[in-house]
Amino acid sequence: MSIDAGRERILCRLEDIPDGCARGFLPVDRDDRVFVVRRGERVHVYINSCPHNWRPLDYAQDRFLSASGSEIVCYAHGAHFSIDSGECIAGVCIGQFLIPVPARVDNGMILIARELPQPPE
């Protein structure tokens, strides 16, 4: 595994997230909440903040996906987002995007950017 320690950090093992599921994280020593959606060997990582009002998307721990598992859902106002792009495709913030976090899988580990993007204030 090759980690650029100045730019990346290990979030977790890929196997810690079942395929087709999502999991939320509070990175160590950070106030930034992120969540990961796993699709096979690929992951999509976003800041856990809805662009409608910049509040967390999940109503309960790790509840980020629609019942079918095909979309990310903000349970506060019912906005639906594409897993692949983070774009709101239904609800109060159509056309707005979740904030993506640079991430990759290397040797079974999920690596994310050390410096995370921030939602607007």
What is the role of each PLM region?
Residues 1-67, 82-83, 97-121:
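N-terminal pre-ligand scaffold of iron-sulfur
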Residues 64-73, 88-96:
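Short cysteine/histidine-rich metal-coordination sites, predominantly Zn2+-binding motifs
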Residues 81-82, 90:
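Short beta-strand His + acidic residue motifs that chelate non-heme Fe in jelly-roll/DSBH
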